[in-house]
Amino acid sequence: MTDPRLTRSRELLTAAITSALDHPGDAQPSITELCAEAGVSRPTFYQHFGDVSSLIEAAAVERMHALFGSVTPVSSAEEWEPAVPRVVHGLLDGLLVHADFYRRVLTGGTARAVQESVVAFLAQRLLTFSPLAERESAAGDHARVERFATFLAAGTTWLVVGWLLEGDSRRPAAAAATDIAELLVTGVASQRLAALHSTSAK
């Protein structure tokens, strides 16, 4: 059973780094500063994280997962396509609310690790809520469908991150969401994927 004190101290440290990164600037808080803000000791910090970067990564992944979780998933593959623009728009709006935070975690030393986590998370959601779920569960090469989902998730993540980091010159969220959603829907509906799946099932 998890010690509630450990759970609480981890939450306090995550809240401390999240608050620090929510403000403009590039300075990274020290372990001493974070411990003071969270009200925990340095040994407690090291019980959870090896360094500040690993704490930043954990906080970023937690916030990204919460953002994805706030978007209501569709109930069937048939409803997925018309819902994609709304879902993508909601994600972009959510990123903008904490633009300073995401800019800092997506341009610093944690950028790759955070993006890899987001790609894996998005790929899993595609395999769960999109028409890929039906193809993945049918007889055939599951690994191929999973790789395709990862490919789509990586491309989507790249476009979203690029849009966010454009700063004041970025296009309106609605316009960007429309384009990203169209590419995502086209990819999932790809006849090439259907052909690959059909061939692998033989």
Language-model segments: residues:
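Conserved acidic
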Residues: R5, S9, W80-A83, V87, ...
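Hydrophobic alpha-helical connector segments
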Residues: V71-F101, A111
